[in-house]
Amino acid sequence: MGRVDAAALIQMGHVDAQHYLANATERGDPLTPETLMMTAAEPGISFQETMQGNFSLGATDPDAGAAAGQSAGTTLAIHVTVTVRDLDRFTADPNHNGSLVGTVDFTPLGLAMPAGQGVFRLFAPADAANTTLMVYELPFEHGGQAYYLAGAKRIHDDPGFDLWSDTTTLYTRLFEGSDATGKVVGAGVLRLNAAAFARVTASVRAVDASSPVEAARLIAQFGGFFARELWKSYAPGPFK
């Protein structure tokens, strides 16, 4: 516990590569030990999550895309490792930003397509009242074309018990290009079933913790934040 795993190393490599490309001169930088040294990372937590569901090219609305995908028998799946570092900053940030890397499976395009440094936000503000979002966004390429998969779980207390469906349903669109401003070329709804949710919970671990005590503290801090935000959204009015 607390050691750097493969997913964290990949993520750190992505960050350092992006920093290098953004700041490199035409002649590049010298290959000195200082240049090649990987950036030190703040301790945090990570977890792994797989979501899949019906998805269709040509659709622009997630529900319509899910219906079309069900009729055609086409599904899309994402397999991601989410990392949240510097939990004090994370909880203070209104958008609660983390990051993710992973792969995308979508038979019309390909399987295990690598997705680079993506966006993760937990309980981020939404335009609608009394609503927050769990945001998952992944850039990937296929056949020389850049794509951007953007999805959100909508956290909003409706009549009845909807906490489970809200936290396990990802409304997703596929954009051409490197961000969510491009043309929408597909849409669908991805879900997390009970077995997959149990695997998410079991995968939560501390990263770069200095000791088992710090690792336990990091996991407890993240778990406490998650529970408090759910309580704010779903607890009966007098108890919030």
Model regions: which residues?
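All-alpha RGS (Regulator of G-protein Signaling) helical domain and cognate RGS-like helical scaffolds
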Residues: 2-33
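Beta-strand-enriched cores of mature, soluble protein domains
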Residues: 36-240
